[in-house]
Amino acid sequence: MFTLKKSLLLVFFLGTISLSLCEDERNADEDDGEMTEEVRRGLMDSLKGLAATAGKTVLQGLLKTASCKLEKTC
């Protein structure tokens, strides 16, 4: 009976450890996904800001040219 208890305790202990390791790996994988999403979001925000700045610059140039031609001061 003592040998059976020892074996069951060993199986339970090893199962608990392997389950714990699997959960740690799963949590690590989920964390990597969150970091990637944050990096992508940061990259998209940077690109949007760059596009907005470029758009403003182009529009300002077009407006200056149009006002110059309308006022005939070019």
From Swiss-Prot:
Organism ancestry: Eukaryota, Metazoa, Chordata, Craniata, Vertebrata
GO CC field: extracellular region
Keyword Signal: yes
BP term (GO), one: defense response
Organism for this UniProt entry: Pelophylax fukienensis (Fukien gold-striped pond frog)
Protein name as catalogued: Pelophylaxin-3
Main subcellular localisation: secreted
Signal peptide (UniProt feature, chain positions): 1-22
Localization per Swiss-Prot or TrEMBL: Secreted
